Amino acid sequence: MTEISTHYSYLYNILKDIASDNELSPLLLFKGGTSLMFFHDLPRFSVDLDFTLIDKEREQFVYDRLLNLAIKYGKIVDNNLGFFGPKIVLSYGRGSWNLKIEVSNRYWGEKADTLTLDGFSLNVMSLSDMYAHKLIALEERTGVATRDIFDIWFFEEKKVSPNEEIIRKRKERSLLEQLTVDISILERFPNNRILSSLAPLLTSDSVKWARTHLLSETISSLQRRVSSERVNQRFKKGTSITPPKGNKGLKR
């Protein structure tokens, strides 16, 4: 088995174990790149399992349960119940990727879709909420993660609208303001670094495309969304869009 197929099998089996735990599963919202890969056909590989904890009072229980679950699959090389929630890092073999399970205890009222894979079901964060968090992640990470750029492009390709309410709760700014921040970050990002850490997660054809198109297409997509958002705001305020003077119609 290749490294990707081996890692995929570990991700799959751990998710199946979580789904079969009737006490653990309802407390978790599956999110992030791996959820997009499993349930929404994200065209890149993702190596970690990310969740949001719905009930912070059950944090210790969730941490202990995940630790007992993960230890069946290999060696725990790092684990802690940190300020922002549980983290467990699993190593299952020499030369392989580590598998990180991370649970955020910051619940912002995100919506969930119950989605089914091969007979087991998980609560998966809505695409709209995930996209809002992804726009914020681009800004908040220490250094730009190129997988965030790829995922933003993916959300735009699927015509997902980010949930502005999440952005307002987390950043106290509008969607338009967040988009402006992100475009500025992307415009400063050097294109020759676009494949940094991203290339191993893509097919060879996708690597060729990403090298020349990913950054520019992502910027263009966000710029289009900014234009659309400005029009939406004008209509919300009751401002009509009038044609220029002297353009009252075609003369025959």
Task: Locate predicted features.
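Structured mid-to-C-terminal alpha-helical surface segments
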Residues: 1-28, 39-42, 53-252
